[in-house]
Amino acid sequence: MNGPLKKNFAEFFAGIGLMRIGLERAGWSIAFANDIDEDKWEMYRTHFGNTGKFAVGDIHKLDVSMIPDVALATASFPCNDLSLAGARKGLAGEQSSAFWGFVNVLTELGLRRPPMVLLENVAGFLTSNNGDDFRDALIALNRLGYAVDAFIVDAVRFVPQSRQRLFVVATKSKIISALNETPKFYESECRPVKFLQTQFA
């Protein structure tokens, strides 16, 4: 890898663009987005305007030639079958099996496969089918040449609500050094403790 990576990304299972909001605040640029839900696309368009980068459609049928070269692919795939509130059918379930559509996209990209992948989902993904689903997902990424790590972040660090989310970071070798930046961890000014500190400092 010569020189720093271009900080652009493709947002799969884009929804209304929450991943995009966070990454753009960190200096990343959107290059492509995809979601199957037309209603979410309408909200996405209302918020961001530039819909030329948004492809509405089933990820299982996505034409990968539409996807530009990017440094990062994000996937907040459906949690319905992984959540404790759901039927716990796991990655074989009708909704959460969309993860395999994402894996197929990465596979079909071949040499254009992004050097970094970020998955986001409920913490229940770790224990779905006694951990077999999480293991299978990591193995699938390993087979595509990615080294994988995972961590949980609680939303209480940012907003007045405790909500744990699982993040899986997958990278190809020697990629992190090419980013040429120091990771930063932000805490929202909207948290009650922050508000009180500013009001009564």
Role assignments for model-derived ranges:
Residues P4-N8:
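Extreme N-terminal starter segment of soluble prokaryotic enzymes
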Residues E11-I16:
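Class I SAM-dependent methyltransferase "Motif I" SAM/SAH-binding loop
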Residues E24:
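Gly/Ala-rich phosphate-binding loop of Rossmann-like dinucleotide-binding domains
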Residues I30-D35:
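Conserved SAM-binding motif I beta-strand of class I
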Residues E38-E42:
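Short alpha-helix immediately C-terminal to the canonical SAM-binding loop
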Residues N50-I59:
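Conserved SAM-binding strand-loop segment of SAM-dependent methyltransferases
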Residues L62-L72, N80, L84-A201:
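Class I S-adenosyl-L-methionine
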